[in-house]
Amino acid sequence: MMLFFSSFSDWFPGVNVFRYITFRTIAAMLTSGLIVFLFGPSIIASLKLRQGKGQPIRADGPQTHFKKAGTPTMGGLMILTGIVVSAFLWCNLSNIYFWVSLLVMLSFGAIGFYDDYLKVTKQTDKGFSGKARLSLEFFVAAIAAFIILQIGSSGFALPFLKDYLIHLGWFFIPFSAFVIVATGNAVNLTDGLDGLAIVPVMVAALSFALIAYLCGNMNFADYLQIHYVSGTGELAVLLGAVVGAGLGFLWFNAPPAAIFMGDTGSLALGGLLGTVAVATKHEIVLVLIGGLFVVEAFSVVIQVGYFKLTRKRVFLMAPIHHHFEKKGWTESQVVIRFWIISIVLALIGLSTLKLR
């Protein structure tokens, strides 16, 4: 919306700054953070009143988690509100990548909201059918992948190679849908401790904001010899809003958390990250930058698969952050150490932009 005012720069030279993606990214970050920070307390109070007992605590979880009983969930509503309002103010609303990313984020958020609603109302840690949830997620992700295919290429880039795409043809749709759904659920599995998921999400969002900006700028893309994707630069503004909203949410989610993100937030943010990775052709780099999410997801896959085969467990508890809690790490130790890992992995992922 604010981009519109840049057309009056002949009369008001100062508004020309709205043309710049870098300025609007910072502005979106500050706007979304302020919205979440200001309206957070009232949203938390409303959710606490409506939810009563709050999010159910896993009976087989660490004993220290039972003191969290009564903490409201669906905190993703705060995050999504900040992102959407800020995005509509600062993003280029004619950009198709913006709308595709918003479609996935809000659709995944709605799926997560319904899952949270069932958990709270039924007071169980099980939401609605996993198959039904995955089916809905794949449906939304496939639509997004189809749209991206229509406006771009069917390829994905390999790290360390100069502007080289592996073209998938129509297989691009199921491949991209898998990336989006897998990322959404990986972030969802990571969201198990106070502040654990939101900081790695912000780290990944900031990293992909840079990637989106570079991929969408012909000069930078040519200099770095990465694939140029016209229009993706605008995703940096949207991801800036994610970072700002995440900072605002962390104020309330820091231990001891006043609110949990819930599936409402984790699915939405993960789905958004996956969509941006697909749009910028950096799906493989997402595995590096979002490596913490990958490890969390694979720990569950390994645990479930091994248990079905042997009736034994590889980890004391999955996802893997609970394993370290069972090993004697405090919650703060797990969270901060996982934050450090996510930052290191992001730096490794970003280094691939230059190492070609």
UniProtKB/Swiss-Prot annotation:
CDD domains: GT_MraY. It is a multi-pass membrane protein. This is Phospho-N-acetylmuramoyl-pentapeptide-transferase. It is found in: Cell inner membrane. Catalyzes the initial step of the lipid cycle reactions in the biosynthesis of the cell wall peptidoglycan: transfers peptidoglycan precursor phospho-MurNAc-pentapeptide from UDP-MurNAc-pentapeptide onto the lipid carrier undecaprenyl phosphate, yielding undecaprenyl-pyrophosphoryl-MurNAc-pentapeptide, known as lipid I. One of its GO terms (molecular function) is UDP-N-acetylmuramoyl-L-alanyl-D-glutamyl-meso-2,6-diaminopimelyl-D-alanyl-D-alanine:undecaprenyl-phosphate transferase activity. It catalyses: UDP-N-acetyl-alpha-D-muramoyl-L-alanyl-gamma-D-glutamyl-meso-2,6-diaminopimeloyl-D-alanyl-D-alanine + di-trans,octa-cis-undecaprenyl phosphate = di-trans,octa-cis-undecaprenyl diphospho-N-acetyl-alpha-D-muramoyl-L-alanyl-D-glutamyl-meso-2,6-diaminopimeloyl-D-alanyl-D-alanine + UMP. Its cofactor is Mg(2+). Pathway: Cell wall biogenesis; peptidoglycan biosynthesis. The chain crosses the membrane at residues 25-45, 70-90, 93-113, 138-158, 164-184, 195-215, 235-255, 258-278, 284-304, 333-353. Its main location: membrane. The gene is mraY. One of its GO terms (biological process) is regulation of cell shape. It comes from Bartonella tribocorum (strain CIP 105476 / IBS 506). Keywords: Cell cycle, Cell division, Cell inner membrane, Cell membrane, Cell shape, Cell wall biogenesis/degradation, Magnesium, Membrane, Metal-binding, Peptidoglycan synthesis, Transferase, Transmembrane, Transmembrane helix. Its EC number is 2.7.8.13. GO terms for cellular component: plasma membrane. Belongs to the glycosyltransferase 4 family. MraY subfamily. InterPro entries: Glycosyl_transferase_4, PNAcMuramoyl-5peptid_Trfase, PNAcMuramoyl-5peptid_Trfase_CS.
